[in-house]
Regions:
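Class I SAM-dependent transferase core
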Residues: 2-45
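Mobile active-site "lid"/loop adjacent to the S-adenosyl-L-methionine
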Residues: 124-153
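Conserved SAM/SAH cofactor-binding pocket of Class I
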Residues: 40-133, 156
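Conserved Class I SAM-dependent methyltransferase catalytic core
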Residues: 148-199, 203-205
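A generic structural micro-feature
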Residues: 66-67, 113-114, 202-206, 220
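SAM/dcSAM-binding transferase cores
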Residues: 204-245
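General small-molecule cofactor/ligand-binding pocket signal
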Residues: 22, 99-101, 192-195
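Short, structurally constrained coil/turn elements
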Residues: 15, 43, 94, 185-188
Length: 245
C-alpha cells in the first residue's frame, strides 16, 4: 500500500519478507538493540504479542516477519512515532495483524485486559532520570532516558499483562543487571535466559538480552556471548544472520 511520507521521513528495507519501515533520522531511528532483541526472542504462530514502547514499530514488524504471531500490538506514548508505526504497518499491508496503540506504559494495565498476552517485548529507556538532558521532551531523550517510565513501570505492567507461563523479552544495559534481576523476581517474572552482547571480543559487554517467564521455576541459562563486530564495520556471521542479510 502507498502511504504518505512526512517531511524528513524515509523508507528503509528491513531485509525480512520484503518489509519496510518509515523513519525520520532527525527524530529517532531504530537501533541494533531492537534487532538483536527480535533475534533473541521466540514466539509461536498462535501467540498474541505486545511490544511496550514500540517507537516506530520495528519490533512488531520483525516479530511478524519471523514468527507470524496470530496478532501483535505495539504501545507507544509519542504520537509522532505511533503515527509512523501505523503507516509502516499499512505500507506492509499488515493492518489485520498488527495494531499500534497510542498510550502510556504506566497505563498499559488499564488499556489492555489482564493476562492477555503470550509474549511481551520491550526495548526500554536505559538511562536513569534526566541527568545531562537539555530537553527532556525531545523524542530521542524520551526513548533513551527514564523520563516517562521507569524499569519498574515496565516490569510491573508486564507482570499484569502476561498470561501465566507467558514470556517476557527485554534488552537493557549490563550496568543495571542487578536491579533488573531484583525487579523481575519481585514481580514473579522468573529470569530464564540471558545473553551478554559485546561490541568486540576484547571489549566489555554493552547490552544484555533477558528472557523471563511469569510464574516460572527458578533456573536460568546463560547463553554464549554474542559478539557484534569481527573488525570495524564488519559484523560477525551471527549478526548478519539476525539481520537477515
Amino acid at each position: 500500500m502507498k502511504v504518505e511520507l512526512r517531511d524528513k521521513e524515509r523508507i528503509d528495507d528491513l531485509q525480512r519478507n520484503g518489509y519496510q519501515i518509515i523513519q525520520n533520522p532527525e527524530k529517532f531511528c531504530f537501533g541494533m538493540d531492537a534487532v538483536l532483541l527480535t533475534g533473541f526472542a521466540h514466539a509461536r504462530e498462535r501467540d498474541t504479542m505486545l511490544d511496550l514502547g514500540t517507537g516506530t514499530g520495528i519490533i512488531p514488524l520483525l516479530m511478524e516477519a519471523k514468527y507470524h504471531c496470530s496478532h501483535l500490538t505495539g504501545l507507544e506514548i509519542q504520537e509522532e512515532s505511533a503515527d509512523m508505526a501505523r503507516r509502516s504497518v499499512a505500507l506492509n499491508d499488515l493492518q489485520d495483524r498488527i495494531d499500534i496503540v497510542t498510550g502510556d506504559i504506566k497505563e498499559a494495565d488499564r488499556i489492555f485486559p489482564a493476562a492477555s498476552f503470550d509474549c511481551i517485548t520491550c526495548n526500554p529507556p536505559y538511562m536513569i532520570g534526566q541527568h545531562g538532558l537539555t530537553n527532556p521532551e525531545e523524542p530521542k531523550a524520551i526513548a533513551r532516558h527514564e523520563v516517562l517510565c521507569t524499569l519498574e513501570d515496565v516490569v510491573s505492567r508486564t507482570a499484569k499483562l502476561l498470561k501465566p507461563g507467558g514470556h517476557f523479552y527485554m534488552v537493557h544495559r549490563p550496568f543495571r543487571l542487578a536491579e533488573i534481576m531484583t525487579m523481575l523476581v519481585k514481580y514473579k517474572l522468573e529470569p530464564k535466559r540471558m545473553q551478554l552482547v559485546y561490541p568486540y571480543i576484547d571489549k566489555e559487554p554493552n547490552m544484555v538480552l533477558i528472557e523471563a517467564v511469569r510464574g516460572g521455576r527458578s533456573r536460568m541459562t546463560v547463553e554464549k556471548p554474542l559478539i557484534v563486530y569481527q573488525a570495524p564495520g564488519v559484523y560477525m556471521p551471527e549478526i548478519y544472520d539476525i539481520y537477515g542479510y
